[in-house]
A protein has these predicted regions:
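Non-catalytic, usually N-terminal nucleic-acid engagement modules in DNA/RNA processing proteins
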Residues: 1-97
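Conserved small/polar residues in nucleotide/adenosyl-binding loops
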Residues: 161-167
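Alpha/beta enzyme core
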Residues: 86-103, 111-137
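Active-site beta-loop-alpha junctions enriched in small/polar residues
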Residues: 8-10, 62, 107-113, 137-139
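Alpha-helical scaffolding segments of alpha/beta enzyme cores, especially the outer helices
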Residues: 44-47, 75-82, 86-89, 115, ...
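Hydrophobic faces of well-ordered beta-strands that scaffold small-molecule active sites
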Residues: 3-6, 57-59, 104-108, 132-134, ...
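Short, well-ordered coil/turn segments that N-cap beta-strands
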Residues: 1, 54-55, 100-104, 128-130, ...
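Active-site-adjacent beta->alpha loops and helix N-cap segments on the catalytic face
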Residues: 68-73, 140-150
Length: 168
């Protein structure tokens, strides 16, 4: 059975009140259990998912609230795309640990702004990965906006033919 692991981007979104700090380096937060400090970076998140042995590994991303203003959403998308480049570099320089293929999926962010979603989708599909995920939806935006963003992303993705199926 295939295993998919999440990078923790959505979990970071839910860490309000834990001293969460989002920077270019990654995300620092305190454990809600014992107060210990932790740092997630694109690189160590890739390493963790490699160690888990997931078949599908999600890129590390920031999941901004659905109600984010345009400037914050644009800044967040820029950060997510820079983190994605670091995820791809780390993933591609490491090998699976358990003798089977693992796949890194970019996550398409952009809140409910069509131009940001379009930019994110174009970037994601340009990386020639086996798939991608649509992130940052169902986080406070109205349902009709969520469906509109899915449509924006799907229009981009179906115009590319980068899906490669493994052969046996």
């Amino acid at each position: 059975r295939p295993i998919l692991t999440d990078s923790g981007g959505f979990q970071v979104f839910s860490l309000t009140g834990t001293g969460r700090k989002i920077t270019e380096e990654g995300v620092t937060f305190r454990s809600h259990i014992d107060g210990s400090k932790h740092l997630f970076t694109p690189e160590n998140v890739m390493d963790i998912q490699r160690q888990i042995g997931a078949d599908i590994v999600m890129a590390f991303d920031e999941c901004p609230p659905g109600t984010s203003d345009y400037n914050y959403a644009r800044h967040s998308l820029g950060l997510t795309q820079r983190w994605l480049e670091r995820c791809v570099a780390r993933f591609d320089e490491t090998a699976p640990l358990y003798g089977y293929e693992q796949n890194l999926f970019p996550i398409v962010q952009g809140c409910t702004y069509r131009d940001l979603r379009k930019k994110a989708a174009e970037h994601a599909v340009s990386l020639n990965r086996a798939g991608y995920a649509i992130g940052g939806l169902a986080v406070g935006e109205p349902a009709e906006e969520m469906y509109a963003m899915i449509e924006v992303v799907n229009r981009i993705s179906v115009s590319y033919t980068h899906l490669t199926l493994p052969t046996t």
